[in-house]
Amino acid sequence: MAFCSPAMLNYNIASNFGDSESASVRQTSSPSVLWSAPGHLSPLTLHCQSSLLYAEQPKSPWCEVRPLDPVLPVTRETLKRKTNGSDCTSPIASNPGSKRDAHFCAVCSDYASGYHYGVWSCEGCKAFFKRSIQGHNDYICPATNQCTIDKNRRKSCQACRLRKCYEVGMMKCGSRRERCGYRILRRHRNSEDCMGKTKKYNEAATRVKEILLSTVSPEQFVLTLLEAEPPNVLVSRPSKPFTEASMMMSLTKLADKELVHMIGWAKKIPGFIDLSLYDQVRLLESCWMEVLMIGLMWRSIDHPGKLIFAPDLVLDRDEGKCVEGILEIFDMLLAMTSRFRELKLQHKEYLCVKAMILLNSSMFPLSPEEPESNRKLHHLLNVVTDALVWVIAKSGIPSQQQTTRLANLLMLLSHVRHASNKGMEHLLSMKCKNVVPVYDLLLEMLNAHTLRGQRKSPVTHPEFEQVSHFQV
């Protein structure tokens, strides 16, 4: 067995420490230089000793107690193994039932570190939920709010991750069961107390928000609307000659992009996010086409005979002839734009009118189970109306003309609603004829419009929770 000795493997310690040829030997990190050569082990075993420290049986020479044991770092795992009398076996091997007893994160299916916020969860999801409930929760899903949340993709979409946290039962008052030694009755009582305190806190916070909203001046409210304005969206202009498919493809792509920005715009309106989620979504579902159209009119107000869909998509009436049934809608849009031009619509007036369209859009009863949200909505409508009256008064025209101007602006909203219904019917027709595919948020908005038309009564809250694009 001479060929297995450390001398053959250059692990021997040179006697002459001044010799330059032995420098590399002294720098070796192999701990075998400190022990006598186990003649019955192969060179491969000597080079794999770090893994064998946990894999060999206790009878292995590597597990014998030696004077140089303190050279190894003493860690918590090392002490645990020594206490269990198995210094060379892995924790899993020493406890065959550990895998069976392991818990998994209810959100991402990773190994759970404990019982956090009412469910078993990992450290990552626990920290994410903690950040979210402390105020950092203005997340928007860039897709269809159906992203897969697992160990590898949990960071890809914060909105869907937070939605899943709530779906699996995470809550602010969740107790850590593994650290709780109380009886079940006491745990329930503590939970009820916590929920009661949370309810009182939420009610107090709501009153504070209402007071703050009522004290906001019309000027401050209009400035907030100005800051909430979404950016211009670009879309590639279809190449000529225009076809029905290419034109509709450009328009639907533009609408889908604008819908994403519309959600962010609505959430920035003071008081909107204080409404119930049910009411927020119903309002947006009811007015999205109107908001898109009045934005189109505002962009086109200084361009007679043109419709400025986007900075890089400018169309006139004749260019719409390639799409069946769209000329009637183009004529309505051009006529309303001309009327706004005659009234010399100001930018701040446009901001207030657009917010009014959103807040006054639902023709169905809002959440019957949350009358508080309905009351907030009416209060918010009064705030927007006051802001519009203030903007008109700031123009300097006489009081009688101010009343007339307010009436003229409000009367145009019914025409915007009529054009919106025509546009919705046309888009549904194009979709049913397979002229253009409709995806993502635009598709869900269309489906919601169709379902609402087929229903005689508004949706119930549990059913509606399936529509989750606006979950934060």
From Swiss-Prot:
Principal location class: nucleus
GO cellular component terms, A-Z: chromatin; nucleus
Residue stretches making up the NR LBD domain: 217-449
UniProtKB keywords: DNA-binding, Lipid-binding, Metal-binding, Nucleus, Receptor, Steroid-binding, Transcription, Transcription regulation, Zinc, Zinc-finger
Zinc finger (NR C4-type): 105-125, 141-165
InterPro entries, sorted: ER-beta-like_N (IPR021064), ER-beta/gamma (IPR028355), Est_rcpt/est-rel_rcp (IPR024178), NHR-like_dom_sf (IPR035500), Nucl_hrmn_rcpt_lig-bd (IPR000536), Nuclear_hormone_rcpt_NR3 (IPR050200), Nuclear_hrmn_rcpt (IPR001723), Znf_hrmn_rcpt (IPR001628)
Stretches for region Modulating: 1-104
GO biological process: cellular response to estradiol stimulus; estrogen receptor signaling pathway; regulation of transcription by RNA polymerase II
Molecular function per GO: estrogen response element binding; nuclear estrogen receptor activity; nuclear receptor activity; steroid binding; zinc ion binding
Residues annotated as transmembrane: none
Family in the record: Belongs to the nuclear hormone receptor family. NR3 subfamily.
Entry function: Binds estrogens with an affinity similar to that of ER-alpha, and activates expression of reporter genes containing estrogen response elements (ERE) in an estrogen-dependent manner.
Record remark: domains: Composed of three domains: a modulating N-terminal domain, a DNA-binding domain and a C-terminal ligand-binding domain.
Quaternary structure and interacting proteins, as annotated: Binds DNA as a homodimer. Can form a heterodimer with ER-alpha.
Descriptive protein name: Estrogen receptor beta
Species this chain originates from: Gallus gallus (Chicken)
